[in-house]
């Protein structure tokens, strides 16, 4: 197919999809959705051989797409000079957590992976699609095996149970990166409020579910937190992530 024809057809398709009206979930009318179709096409992971090698190892053990995994990878790779450990809450089968462990190059850094291993918990009135128990098709053994395959078993610590209620005392009190992938309002809020005073300056918080239909509870929680806490820079990425960067301690 000729280049001009490809461009013409692409433009027509994009134009049609973008012309569709925005929409919202019936249970969360203030969180609006639309066809997010940026024209940008740069795919930096294509030339990142180190990332692609890791991606091929972990991709079958995660529900996170390559765009979000690459963002986690690049963020983690920039934190070698930031003191603190990594924490992921909402692990599923360990793919994204082990990717973080492989990305982090700081000597002595631990990666804590917390999950109930029984599926989503704390679904409530703020949530639109989740009722509890979803994504329960996992197990501790699957995560431990993934850590062995990735050769990060010495750095990874798996925490079983509801976080922070059942296992937070096992996590260090200084965190450089927090990845929250829990799908619902209350669980995301509880994790963030527990972690906030433990985040060092320069730490990064990534919310996996912020931009997705069906996860409006997480969207609402993040928006509320940002308006109430001035010590963070907030980025809404069109890949679905929300990213917070801690720039000041409480009260500064």
Where do the language-model regions lie?
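Membrane-proximal basic amphipathic "stem/tether" segments
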Residues: 1-57, 247
């Amino acid at each position: 197919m000729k280049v001009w024809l490809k461009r013409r057809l692409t433009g027509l398709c994009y134009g049609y999809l973008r012309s569709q009206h925005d929409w919202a979930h019936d249970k969360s009318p203030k969180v609006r959705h639309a066809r997010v179709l940026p024209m940008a096409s740069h795919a930096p992971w294509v030339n990142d051989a180190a990332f692609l090698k890791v991606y091929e190892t972990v991709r079958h053990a995660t529900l996170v797409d390559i765009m979000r995994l690459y963002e986690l990878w690049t963020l983690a790779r920039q934190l070698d000079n930031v003191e603190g450990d990594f924490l992921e809450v909402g692990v599923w089968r360990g793919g994204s957590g082990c990717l973080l462990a492989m990305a982090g190059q700081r000597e002595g850094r631990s990666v804590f992976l917390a999950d109930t291993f029984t599926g989503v918990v704390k679904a409530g009135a703020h949530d639109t699609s989740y009722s509890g128990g979803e994504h329960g098709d996992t197990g501790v053994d699957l995560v431990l095996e993934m850590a062995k395959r990735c050769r990060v078993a010495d750095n990874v610590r798996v925490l079983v149970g509801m976080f922070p209620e059942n296992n937070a005392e096992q996590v260090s009190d200084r965190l450089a990166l927090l990845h929250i992938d829990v799908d619902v309002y209350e669980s995301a809020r509880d994790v963030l409020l527990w972690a906030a005073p433990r985040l060092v300056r320069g730490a990064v918080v990534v919310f996996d579910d912020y931009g997705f239909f069906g996860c409006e509870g997480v969207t609402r929680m993040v928006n509320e937190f940002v308006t109430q806490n001035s010590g963070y820079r907030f980025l809404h990425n069109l890949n679905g992530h929300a990213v917070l960067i801690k720039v000041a301690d409480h009260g500064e």
